[in-house]
From Swiss-Prot:
Leading EC class: hydrolase
Protein encoded by which gene: smrB
Functional note: Acts as a ribosome collision sensor. Detects stalled/collided disomes (pairs of ribosomes where the leading ribosome is stalled and a second ribosome has collided with it) and endonucleolytically cleaves mRNA at the 5' boundary of the stalled ribosome. Stalled/collided disomes form a new interface (primarily via the 30S subunits) that binds SmrB. Cleaved mRNA becomes available for tmRNA ligation, leading to ribosomal subunit dissociation and rescue of stalled ribosomes.
An annotated GO BP: rescue of stalled ribosome
HAMAP family: SmrB (MF_01042)
Domain Smr as annotated: residue spans: 93-168
GO MF term list: RNA endonuclease activity; rRNA binding
Entry keyword Cell membrane: no
Annotated protein name in UniProt: Ribosome rescue factor SmrB
Subunit structure: Associates with collided ribosomes, but not with correctly translating polysomes.
SMART domains assigned: SMR (SM00463)
Amino acid sequence: MNKNDDKEGMAMFSALIEGIKPIAQDKRHFRTPLKTKQEIELKEQQLHADSYFSDTYQPLLPVQGPMRWLDEGVDSLELKRLRRGDYQPDLLLDLHGYRQSEAKLELAALIQACVKQQSQCCCVMHGYGTGILKQQVPMWLVQHPKVKAFHQAPKEWGGDAALLVLIDIGDQPHRR
């Protein structure tokens, strides 16, 4: 090829495209939407739930009698106070109708809310029977580092279908 062929080729190309208008830009460039506060909180809850709760961990919990557990280093009097109903729960979580994965997220969110609101005691209603949640909730609670103790709730807070949970909220004085 020589320069004359290039000039002829360019001239023919120019003649062919003469009168053609360029296409107007019709593509929109969308920004990725910013995450809402709810989405961020949900992601954070999932992260907390996944890091604290394992479905395979089997703690040593009582088989007979009321469901109860006390963390090491916590006075046994606290468990007695929970049993008698001396602690009034400030927050209540009803897990009826929840799937296991949803219940795990809600439980993590409840514990986080208790710490945030400086609420030392909460009530978790898992329901009657021998269902999955009734078995899993105590196992999850044992694994969370902020849970100091839990006991089957007194009748006024749900009895066999609920647990009163004592949360470690830091160095705040105990509030009953």
